[in-house]
Amino acid sequence: MTEEHIEEIINAIKELQEDTSIPKSIKLKLQKMIEILSENENTSIKINKTLHELEKIDNDNNTDSYIRTQLLNIASMLENA
């Protein structure tokens, strides 16, 4: 995965984070995902950690279908990178 792909994923997460309909608890988890992807670490480790955070959000009862769809798009970007 190149830095361009990581930046693209970070931008997608930031775009979702700016949505006013998203609960604060989910926004905090999205911020953690951005921090993980910004770390100086092996790319595959960053991807796995980020996917784990996505799973936590998906299991959250506050997550509505729109947010789940956006998270699936981000997960797809991570898995295809």
Residue ranges: model-predicted function:
Residues 1-81:
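Peripheral, non-catalytic segments of secretory and membrane proteins
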